[in-house]
From Swiss-Prot:
It comes from Prochlorococcus marinus (strain AS9601). GO terms for biological process: tRNA pseudouridine synthesis. This is tRNA pseudouridine synthase A. The lineage of its organism: Bacteria, Bacillati, Cyanobacteriota, Cyanophyceae, Synechococcales. The gene is truA. It catalyses: uridine(38/39/40) in tRNA = pseudouridine(38/39/40) in tRNA. The active site is at D52. PANTHER family: PSEUDOURIDYLATE SYNTHASE, TRNA PSEUDOURIDINE SYNTHASE-LIKE 1.
Length: 268
């Protein structure tokens, strides 16, 4: 028996998220079926982050235990021959039995992409939110967001239906920047609440459009005014960039060669 880790990229447009659900098309379901074809028995998979319906991943991390003669570094090629073009295994490696895709991660990184141009761009439409009511003030958005860094109770940024015992988590870093017409919101945290990033982005857009002040934004989450947090950004603009570990087991995760070109920092 060996433990194998996968670095996975997927277009979540037509999937109901990562986690298996009854009568739903999910990433985990497709991957598990591919593993079943290889081994002829059920293999349990674990992910660094549970992406929701319509959310993408450029560097999702998954592991599973398997009793098979196939070398750990060969699973990428074997699985890619069985998976649809919307799911790609970028790298596969054998890891220690104690290593866990979810619990060994120091933090996770999500990026939200807003297309703030006057006109939609069909070439990036499935991976960004076209939002143009006015030019967004990304500096105002950044300043408003910075107070969220550190460990806080983000109850206001949690959708109903979560089974977490509490809403406290630690944001390691948050950044908002403009690359031409794209606004990139990057959040790195030890963990994320259900719907957290999309709710944060929805509120930050209101700040950028000067519909609410940074002070109102802060008041809403600090004082847990969940009923005032109604705007959730569409799923298609959200991407799970990667999970970061103290012991990095992958080679490709050290750089951005697996990240969509139009989302790379500084691209113009």
């Amino acid at each position: 028996m060996k433990r194998v880790a996968l670095l996975v990229q997927y277009d979540g447009s037509h999937y109901s998220g990562w986690q298996k659900q009854k009568n739903a098309n999910t990433i985990q379901e497709i991957l598990d079926k591919a593993l079943l074809k290889i081994t002829n028995h059920t293999v349990k998979t674990f992910a660094a982050g549970r992406t929701d319906a319509g959310v993408h991943a450029s560097g999702q991390v998954i592991h599973f235990d398997i009793d098979c003669v196939i070398p750990g570094n060969s699973y990428s090629d074997v699985l890619n021959s069985l998976l649809p073009s919307t799911i790609r295994i970028l790298e596969s490696v054998e890891v220690k039995d104690s290593w866990h895709a979810c619990y060994s991660a120091s933090y996770r990184h999500y990026r939200y992409v807003i297309n703030n141009s006057k006109f939609p761009n069909l070439f990036i439409n499935n991976w960004s939110w076209h939002r143009y009511q006015k030019v967004l003030d990304e500096v105002l958005m950044l300043n408003a967001s910075k107070k969220m860094e550190g460990e806080h109770d983000f109850f206001a940024f949690q959708k109903s239906g979560s089974n977490r015992q509490n809403s406290i988590t630690k944001i390691k870093n948050i950044d908002v920047k403009r690359v031409e017409d794209l606004i990139l919101v990057d959040i790195k945290a030890t963990g994320f609440l259900y719907g957290m990033v999309r709710l944060i982005v929805g509120q930050l857009v209101l700040v950028g459009e000067k519909k609410i002040s940074p002070e109102i934004f802060t008041d809403r989450w600090v004082n847990k005014k969940k009923n005032d947090v109604k705007e959730s950004a569409p799923a298609k603009g959200l991407c799970f960039v990667n999970a970061v570990y103290e012991e990095n087991v992958f080679k490709k995760i050290k750089n951005n060669d697996f990240f969509p070109i139009f989302l790379i920092e500084g691209f113009s």
